[in-house]
Amino acid sequence: MLIIAKYPSKCFLPAIEKPYPLIVDFLKTRFSRIPKQQWVDRINGGLVFFKNGKKITTESLCVPLTMLLYYRTVDEEISIPFKEKIIYMDDNILAVNKPHFLPVMPAGKYINQNLLTRLKDKTGNNDIVPVNRIDRETSG
């Protein structure tokens, strides 16, 4: 069963010269570990689009200096049972005690089982940005 990330990731399209490449080719080059067919499937499934909401097709050309949003997918994701603890929160700062084995941000096979996604869910704040990223094996 394909698992889709709860929140989109961002990719900025740089200033490039004409002729502009297809977005699918740019993404394949930018994210070389992801097969082109996976990008085609994401695009056809509506999981890749411009930040303004405009749909992208496999024939869409890059538009320099624009933002793409895309949803990561994985075939399976292991549930991480350890819980984070919010230790301080105000309008500008959120301090959290992160458990072992929980990645800070979506990466690799962890697209929903990560601290950032959990905190967005818990607080309702989709603008959270980590300022200290410790690795998956580290707690604190």
What function would you assign to each model-found segment?
Residues 1-140:
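RNA pseudouridine synthases
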